[in-house]
């Protein structure tokens, strides 16, 4: 664990070569010595080659011929704006900290979490695998177009046999060459890429020179079959040289049929082809594990590559529009060979771009796979991809990826996969934009990238534009990719992943919660919108598990805080003993499946600790208004962890993932007769303190006897029928009259109604008991109570019970806070409590047809039993010396009643107005 003595930056000052570098942590792709690629070789070259691909040689005429120069420029501008928005996000994330192996996957997973990062990382990996196969098959087709034995026309060199098997053989041989280069390390790949870059640059240079040096000429176009299979006369295209009329004719759009597919072209279809060839901006980021300084190389190299390719595309668009008529542009997409000073150099460029694209895809895929394997998100299935050479090259991931590409090559034609590959790339780009957007919106102080040319507007536009392009290119593939991402995320969520990466969702939640808490003004509170906000004080959760779940049901969308007081004095301790306990309490909340916060404190006494928690728990307008305590009696505590499946498994004491079981983190329950941390005097004083602070109080007794189905999270419709009994009258002051409608009585009704709204208690019948004196006529008081319940929208049965004649005799009522100190003696108070207890017990087993009756009247119809009883809690006496007697009276009152809640409310909680 980090302390103030830990170094702020874990940097090794001197490496083997005397240079400073950070250690390569988890998720890296090798030892530090593997980081040797410069910005140019590691980022610029692979990104340029990936963004050019084969489009730069074979699709310039296609785009300009169908869309015209103006629309082609608009398409290019829109495409590069979309890419540039993602590049800005990449630059921001890459300059905000150390970037290890995995490129885009590393950025996404360390921001959005392992679930989203792992799912998109796997999709990005599969996109690179399929992209490698598509490039190789495109290269095979380009070679066979010139050297194939079945080539039509006289220009071909018919030396290579053709067919499915031969095509697979050629693709496999080329894959072996590409895989060998990647398996031997990033250094050889960089040199091979640089050689390819030189070949492509030389080929493009020859094309640019040819536009100027070659004179006008007629070019015979490939013949097209007639409508009925008849031959048509050969057509000709014209290379006019620089000509104003040619440019004028090429300015507007002229969409026609694609001679290779016969499909009618539209703006969307042409734009999709152009954009498909430009989606290579992550080629450099995928090499992050081999870069000397990825935080500098990735943004700088990517921006240079994007600017360079944009300039070349613009130049080629203008030159083609100035010099080639529309017939040539639409009838021969490979017209560069026809106008070149040396046509074989164009072929070399075509082959070099296809080969470099396949190499870039394969090595990028291997680095993503290695990072996924290092993070252990998919278990043993990716274990072989962890293997690295002595120099840090992940040859295991290369071999793994090579095998998958070989399987994809078996499918032969992959034109249908091209759109899926592009959509998967766009999903990854959108995720990078979303990662940067999340970091920006979270406003975390540690998000301070050195690259500042971005904002949340650019990130949001990047996400929206990538999603739009996905559905423009292929709606089916876009919908399928989002569905696949959701399924993979659900799988990783169920499996569980690393939690030490940090979740930007937590930062976003903090930002939003803080904003809305500041808007939650306690001065605007109204009784119409009152809700319970509970503070449950727990000594040992082993004995309080049923109460913990019952309180969760009582909160009804309100605040629920689990409070615990650790006894001690910080002055006499070397460190705070409370902080290490938070993890165990949070695990308790998770396993008990309750929606609660945890608040712990250190105090010399439980009473003082309770005062601390009552004052400081919560935040802003979300502060506890009700204190919940277990009842103070002599019942031996039970260990509910032993009987609850969520806490008793696994028996070995370890949970899945190797963390200790919760049963090992809390001490065993107190043994019978052992000293308690809280005295009876302090217990009652804590209740009195809460009432002085204007907090409602709930004392819970015998909650361990609650029916298990009533504490479940499901519906209680199929459970055994039970009653919930409410006695909204102070049974220790049983005078008739309107006592049942005081604030405390209404609070009892409100809490019982809240409980009945919980699904597990829907089937329980709410009964409200109305006590009558022996000389009171039944019916009148019941009518008033029913009218009140109707106004409060409370559905309940009302039952009248007759209180014994001696209970009402005697002096007028004392003040509520001094009921023990009045004329009534201890013996009389004890007798009154016993009589009230007998009355309540007599009604617990009665059905709805019992009618009025006293303790002796048990001749009514037997019905459902009482699952929970709500009793009026009298206010503690003013004299602390009377506290033990007060507690004894409460014990007598609630003895043998089963699960009971004694409640005292001090705040209005009901409203009859709209």
From Swiss-Prot:
May be an inhibitor of SLC12A1. Seems to correspond to a subunit of a multimeric transport system and thus, additional subunits may be required for its function. May play a role in lysosomal ion flux and osmoregulation. Residues 645-678, 843-864 are annotated as: Disordered. Gene3D superfamilies: Amino acid/polyamine transporter I (1.20.1740.10). This is Solute carrier family 12 member 9. It is found in: Cell membrane; Lysosome membrane. PANTHER family: SOLUTE CARRIER FAMILY 12 MEMBER 9, SOLUTE CARRIER FAMILY 12, CATION COTRANSPORTERS. It is a multi-pass membrane protein. It comes from Rattus norvegicus. Pfam families: AA_permease, SLC12. InterPro entries: AA-permease/SLC12A_dom, SLC12_C, SLC12A_fam. The keyword Transmembrane applies. One of its GO terms (cellular component) is lysosomal membrane. The lineage of its organism: Eukaryota, Metazoa, Chordata, Craniata, Vertebrata. The chain crosses the membrane at residues 37-57, 73-93, 120-140, 168-188, 194-214, 263-283, 298-318, 339-359, 377-399, 417-437, 467-487, 741-761. Keywords: Cell membrane, Glycoprotein, Lysosome, Membrane, Phosphoprotein, Transmembrane, Transmembrane helix, Transport. Residues 846-855 have a biased composition (Gly residues). Glycans are attached at residues 218, 228, 243.
